[in-house]
Amino acid sequence: MTLSKWILSFGLSVCLIVSHPVSAERIKDLANIQGVRANQLIGYGLVVGLDGTGDQTQQTPFTVQSILSMLGQLGVNLPPGTNLQLRNVASVMVTATLPAFAKPGQQIDVTVSSMGNAKSLRGGTLLMTPLKGIDNQVYAVAQGSLVIGGAGASSAGSSVQINHLGAGRISAGAIVERAVPTVLGQGEYINLELRDTDFTTARRIVDTINSRFSYGTATALDGRVIQLRAPLNNNQRVTFISQIEDLDVIPAQGIAKVIINARTGSVVMNQMVTLESSAVAHGNLSVIINTQPIVSQPGPFAQRGETVVVPQSQIEVRSEEGNLMLLPGSASLADVVKALNAIGATPQDLLAILQALKASGSLRAELEII
């Protein structure tokens, strides 16, 4: 494989973060206000109106039980032992995210996912479904027509499907019924929480806030939490938080890190990765096993005998020579890529090479395998 072809193939499997000067970011993009958070909601419901693509009720007894319970609440009582054969109903799980400061009457999006063996939820309508929080209290009620991003068709045993048919969304499909109390800090203090723990970034945020307001306004409690002295009046506190979020801070550069996905062979490096001078020899080892059955029959005039099939295997081991190659020290990400391309290894082989370079101390980066 030529160097140009290797660079092309390596580029398809290795995602690189291009080195750019670090620019200032808003504090809003680096930290969150402690206590201002979303909450997850979940509920169990029924989707009706499907075109024969719903649950097979004989295999999903919980669907039948849910239908009988719903009909009973609506005043429809079926005789005991009634065998329902329905194909236009599906049991689903409904999930939603309740944003911070959401008030009763506001609408939120919901995601509807099939729970049974329904083939498709396309064209279905979700019936009224209460959505509960972790405390088992109802915070929203969902209902509406599903929007499915996939499509499919089947006939005479053949089928075709595009994207996924077992899940969909309802935009503004739930109405908030209960608000979650959110308190902006305790007393005169509120806390900022950095999204990534970093002492340098925390110090820079503190210095920026104190220079904008007054010394003592911000105090770093640790590498993640910054305490702010804020006004007690709600309106003034909101204005204060807004001004804090719009301040620009240059975040600290992260540690050198190489992310390896062992399943796909993908490798991601950040701009801090460097490489010390090292020598690498890499050879491919392949084992080829070829098995052929050989039939052994008795002679034409033998009185007794049986035909026997004996497998005959041939095992061949091939080892390609790997020349020792010098990798010069690299101070930039582009130089690291150029040095790794010079080895000529496949992306899967590159995983082993990076681990060996890290073990030898030549790769100045933290390896993380996902």
From Swiss-Prot:
GO annotations of cellular component type: bacterial-type flagellum basal body, distal rod, P ring; outer membrane-bounded periplasmic space
Subcellular localization: Periplasm; Bacterial flagellum basal body
Main location: periplasm
InterPro entries, alphabetized: Flag_FlgI
Keyword vocabulary terms for this entry: Bacterial flagellum, Periplasm, Signal
A GO molecular function held by the record: structural molecule activity
Secretion signal, residue range per the UniProt entry: 1-24
GO biological processes: bacterial-type flagellum-dependent cell motility
Highest taxon, organism lineage: Bacteria
Record-stated family: Belongs to the FlgI family.
Entries under HAMAP family matching the protein: FlgI
NCBIfam families: PRK05303.1
Function as written in the Swiss-Prot or TrEMBL entry: Assembles around the rod to form the L-ring and probably protects the motor/basal body from shearing forces during rotation.
Record note on quaternary structure: The basal body constitutes a major portion of the flagellar organelle and consists of four rings (L,P,S, and M) mounted on a central rod.
Listed PANTHER family: FLAGELLAR P-RING PERIPLASMIC PROTEIN FLGI, FLAGELLAR P-RING PROTEIN
Protein name: Flagellar P-ring protein
Organism of derivation: Nitrosomonas europaea (strain ATCC 19718 / CIP 103999 / KCTC 2705 / NBRC 14298)
Taxonomic classification: Bacteria, Pseudomonadati, Pseudomonadota, Betaproteobacteria, Nitrosomonadales
Encoding gene (name): flgI
